[in-house]
Amino acid sequence: MRQLKGRNRCNRAVRHLKIQGKMWLKNLKSGLEQIRESQVRGTRKNFLHDGSFHEAVAPVLAVAQCFCLMPVCGISAPTYRGLSFNRRSWRFWYSSLYLCSTSVDLAFSIRRVAHSVLDVRSVEPIVFHVSILIASWQFLNLAQLWPGLMRHWAAVERRLPGYTCCLQRARPARRLKLVAFVLLVVSLMEHLLSIISVVYYDFCPRRSDPVESYLLGASAQLFEVFPYSNWLAWLGKIQNVLLTFGWSYMDIFLMMLGMGLSEMLARLNRSLEQQVRQPMPEAYWTWSRTLYRSIVELIREVDDAVSGIMLISFGSNLYFICLQLLKSINTMPSSAHAVYFYFSLLFLLSRSTAVLLFVSAINDQAREPLRLLRLVPLKGYHPEVFRFAAELASDQVALTGLKFFNVTRKLFLAMAGTVATYELVLIQFHEDKKTWDCSPFNLD
């Protein structure tokens, strides 16, 4: 009997040593990984980068200003304190001139559509122009709010848990710039393919020069009123490029905001994940709850500023997805048209999905602390933990489309169902018409 008890005691000791050994090896591996990540070459750029959202998003805003959007002064300043909005700056007048030219272009497009057969395809230029015009106006209003918004953003960032190394600190900015760069390059490729497809297969040229023929078709709404001239044709093409970029930039900008806000919540979640399995003082949970509340307040302030852009982005993407899927039934006049069309459709679907996933990550990260609080040991429960859990369970933290819908992962299924429903309705009234006419305006 004594031998059996001794053997059981020995087995328990061996199991305990195995568990302790596994935990020790796991902690050692984690420590070695952190040391490996921290062994980054100490360049001047690494030490100057402060990991702020203002610094990360500055290049994206600089590109936007080249295309008449977000006329904020001081975006290249090292901190948010250099930001300002000035109605006397060239950026403001540049954006105002763009709004006026877009309004005039919209008037010519409405005139052209009014003299044609009205259907879901013919109103495409009007929907495109109206979407960009309203979005540009929203960006102009956002530029006035941007300095105050970045001031609040920086105040919340200062309260967040710090990064463990300079590599981790620079990672969100690199990710943000990479996503923006890829989307801008693909958007440029799409526009170049549209030009190639028209020039390659101009089956009823209006002028002997293929470049002039393309420019005439690209600004057909202008030359139904004015006689053709090269300077007006190039102005029309520049306007078309600005409109095309503005449409893509809406989605890029919303992705940047989604990545920045979700990274804030992710930093809080990483701190909670490290501490949640051990008893923590009540002061820690008070700090965590108040920090979470300050992030939520920032998200709601951002939502008040960009919810109009969110509604336009999702609405226009939904319309053009339905329209492009309807056009896919038609016969393509050439292989160049087919390559451009399906590349454009794939890019539109991918970009719309990316916007939804990046923005819905805010809601995903906001729900993560509720899962982590279930891991708090019994000895570590305090009234602040219950209060924190109650706030997490009752809050709906997400960006919205002008309060009409919350951007969560569930919205993906809702949009997919809407697209399927409208496609079934449109197909019933569809006829295989010659949608690829001589005017490449519909291709841009």
Swiss-Prot record:
<feature type="transmembrane region" description="Helical; Name=1">
    <location>
        <begin position="57"/>
        <end position="77"/>
    </location>
</feature>
<dbReference type="GO" id="GO:0007637">
    <property type="term" value="P:proboscis extension reflex"/>
</dbReference>
<dbReference type="InterPro" id="IPR009318">
    <property type="entry name" value="Gustatory_rcpt"/>
</dbReference>
<dbReference type="GO" id="GO:0050916">
    <property type="term" value="P:sensory perception of sweet taste"/>
</dbReference>
<feature type="topological domain" description="Extracellular">
    <location>
        <begin position="236"/>
        <end position="240"/>
    </location>
</feature>
<feature type="topological domain" description="Cytoplasmic">
    <location>
        <begin position="262"/>
        <end position="305"/>
    </location>
</feature>
<feature type="transmembrane region" description="Helical; Name=4">
    <location>
        <begin position="241"/>
        <end position="261"/>
    </location>
</feature>
<dbReference type="GO" id="GO:0015276">
    <property type="term" value="F:ligand-gated monoatomic ion channel activity"/>
</dbReference>
<protein>
    <recommendedName>
        <fullName>Gustatory receptor 5a for trehalose</fullName>
    </recommendedName>
</protein>
<keyword id="KW-0807">Transducer</keyword>
<dbReference type="GO" id="GO:0033041">
    <property type="term" value="F:sweet taste receptor activity"/>
</dbReference>
<feature type="transmembrane region" description="Helical; Name=2">
    <location>
        <begin position="179"/>
        <end position="199"/>
    </location>
</feature>
<feature type="topological domain" description="Extracellular">
    <location>
        <begin position="327"/>
        <end position="338"/>
    </location>
</feature>
<feature type="topological domain" description="Cytoplasmic">
    <location>
        <begin position="200"/>
        <end position="214"/>
    </location>
</feature>
<feature type="topological domain" description="Cytoplasmic">
    <location>
        <begin position="360"/>
        <end position="410"/>
    </location>
</feature>
<keyword id="KW-1003">Cell membrane</keyword>
<dbReference type="GO" id="GO:0050909">
    <property type="term" value="P:sensory perception of taste"/>
</dbReference>
<dbReference type="GO" id="GO:0010353">
    <property type="term" value="P:response to trehalose"/>
</dbReference>
<dbReference type="Pfam" id="PF06151">
    <property type="entry name" value="Trehalose_recp"/>
</dbReference>
<feature type="transmembrane region" description="Helical; Name=3">
    <location>
        <begin position="215"/>
        <end position="235"/>
    </location>
</feature>
<keyword id="KW-0675">Receptor</keyword>
<keyword id="KW-0472">Membrane</keyword>
<dbReference type="GO" id="GO:0008527">
    <property type="term" value="F:taste receptor activity"/>
</dbReference>
<keyword id="KW-1133">Transmembrane helix</keyword>
<dbReference type="GO" id="GO:0005886">
    <property type="term" value="C:plasma membrane"/>
</dbReference>
<feature type="topological domain" description="Cytoplasmic">
    <location>
        <begin position="1"/>
        <end position="56"/>
    </location>
</feature>
<dbReference type="GO" id="GO:0050912">
    <property type="term" value="P:detection of chemical stimulus involved in sensory perception of taste"/>
</dbReference>
<dbReference type="GO" id="GO:0001582">
    <property type="term" value="P:detection of chemical stimulus involved in sensory perception of sweet taste"/>
</dbReference>
<dbReference type="GO" id="GO:0034220">
    <property type="term" value="P:monoatomic ion transmembrane transport"/>
</dbReference>
<comment type="similarity">
    <text>Belongs to the insect chemoreceptor superfamily. Gustatory receptor (GR) family. Gr5a subfamily.</text>
</comment>
<feature type="transmembrane region" description="Helical; Name=6">
    <location>
        <begin position="339"/>
        <end position="359"/>
    </location>
</feature>
<feature type="topological domain" description="Extracellular">
    <location>
        <begin position="432"/>
        <end position="444"/>
    </location>
</feature>
<keyword id="KW-0812">Transmembrane</keyword>
<feature type="topological domain" description="Extracellular">
    <location>
        <begin position="78"/>
        <end position="178"/>
    </location>
</feature>
<dbReference type="GO" id="GO:0016020">
    <property type="term" value="C:membrane"/>
</dbReference>
<comment type="function">
    <text>Gustatory receptor required for response to the sugar trehalose in taste neurons. Gr5a neurons selectively respond to sugars, in contrast to Gr66a cells which respond to bitter compounds. Flies are attracted to sugars and avoid bitter substances, suggesting that Gr5a neuron activity is sufficient to mediate acceptance behavior. Sugar signal transduction occurs through coupling with G-proteins such as Galpha49B and G-salpha60A.</text>
</comment>
<feature type="transmembrane region" description="Helical; Name=7">
    <location>
        <begin position="411"/>
        <end position="431"/>
    </location>
</feature>
<feature type="transmembrane region" description="Helical; Name=5">
    <location>
        <begin position="306"/>
        <end position="326"/>
    </location>
</feature>
<dbReference type="GO" id="GO:0007165">
    <property type="term" value="P:signal transduction"/>
</dbReference>
